[in-house]
Amino acid sequence: MTIVVCAVRPDSRGTIMARSVDPLQPPAIRPSYLSAASDEQVLLSGTRHARRIFEAPPLARHSAAETMPGSTASSDDAIIDFMHRAGMNLHHPVGTCRMGEDPMAVVDSRLRVRGIAGLRVVDASVMPTVTTGNTNAPSIMIGEKGAAMIREDARAA
């Protein structure tokens, strides 16, 4: 049996930055997983809860020994250390192209990339946070809305 503990609404935020003006150079990607203490606490609580589920009498007799992080990781610090060493992203990262009017925003409210005429970002990159459920439906909605904006702007031109 397997239980995977994950933070479906993480507070941690990473960055993607250009390393150079050369567009062929790969960007610097810093996901900063678990940089928010709240994410550590969510995963710590989830790990403790998962252990209680497996220790409950109906499951205990069917459960094998815990493999990760393992029964020796009993303190909060040991569990959090394991999360930092072995944790990974299980969902779809979003929000790599901030939308808004502030100077750090990549796209404006009509999904146009600032400073590059004719280029838009019409995908999950503009979501401010990851959705609790799969990102497919909201991505389709962004695509439909973006297509409508492109048609509107073409008619107005």
Regions found by a protein language model. Give the residues of each.
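FAD-dependent oxidoreductase catalytic-site/capping-region signature
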Residues: 1-132, 136-138, 146-157
